[in-house]
Amino acid sequence: MPTTRQCSFCGHEIPPGTGLMYVRNDGTMLWFCSSKCRKSMLKYHRDPKKYKWTTRYMKVR
């Protein structure tokens, strides 16, 4: 049975058969639910805690 993965950037669950797997040079695997998450992490180096649409969002006092 296929397993659901969790997006490495936003934290949302990825249904089986969708998403993108990115493998770094050191062998770690990153799973992304959309190109928005992939670009935010790899291209723009954004912090997921600062964006409300992620599950890792934390309000800063």
From Swiss-Prot:
Cofactor note text: Binds 1 zinc ion per subunit.
Cofactor: Zn(2+)
GO MF, one annotated term: rRNA binding
A single cellular component GO annotation: ribosome
PROSITE patterns for the chain: RIBOSOMAL_L24E (PS01073)
SMART domains attached to this UniProt entry: TRASH (SM00746)
Signal peptide as annotated in the record: none
Subunit structure: Part of the 50S ribosomal subunit. Forms a cluster with proteins L3 and L14.
Designated name of the protein: Large ribosomal subunit protein eL24
Organism per entry: Saccharolobus islandicus (strain M.14.25 / Kamchatka #1)
Lineage of source species: Archaea, Thermoproteota, Thermoprotei, Sulfolobales, Sulfolobaceae
